[in-house]
Amino acid sequence: MIETPAHKWIAKFSSSSDTFNVVKSEFVAMRLAALAGLDVAVVQLTAAAGRDVLLIQRFDRQHTADGYQRRAMVSALTILELDELMARYASYETLAEIVRHRFDAPVPTLHELFGRLVFNVLCGNTDDHARNHAAFWNGSSLALTPAYDICPQARAGNEASQAMLIVGQQRSSRLATCLQAAPHFVLDDAAATALIARQITSIQQHFDAVCQEANLAEVDRNLLRVRNILNPAIFEGAPDALQRLVAGFR
């Protein structure tokens, strides 16, 4: 934990066992998510004792004249009334239904949640389990917290699955699955496709600059580009218009 005059920060350190630069890859994904218009935690990169360090600004602490005050939070696992043994049953579809009834500003919240689902698929973050989603609780209603822990995951092949079910029993990391779920987020097919297209365009526009900002090594940059970010497998079954958007990314 690191404290500055106005903020508290959580520090994540690189590990000697990492097979790629996890810390910088998470920074890249979080910055790309913010540039794509999502509400995400503020992140910074630094180094300590020769190791890369990712700093994540705590959004559950508010600085006041009397010091820091805690903001009550609950994880999506708790909201879904599941425990760790039942976490595999956590579902974006079910979470969307709860948002409709228990969250402030449900429609924009649903659109934000759908955007986060899509971005997780686009950037290869398959570790989107229910503890990696949360909401503020004010005693009467819920409000989505900024997104956090968005990190591309190592994958052995092209096919991948999200940690949370997306719609029905489907969790495949494909844009077609996201589009199938879109009505649960109050989005018709055209609106959902347009949202996905905006994110794809934003990622391509900002990828190189954000990697440069992170001073990400060329080998790790190429790994993200080839294996994680906009992986060809996620476009299986997606509209041709979306597939054409990434023709020049690699």
Regions found by a protein language model. Name each.
Residues 75, 79, 83-92, 137-192:
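Catalytic-core segments of enzymes that bind and process phosphorylated/nucleotide-bearing substrates
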Residues 1-89:
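Conserved ATP-binding subdomain of kinase catalytic cores across diverse folds
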Residues 195-200, 218:
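Long, amphipathic alpha-helical stalk/connector segments used for oligomerization, subunit docking
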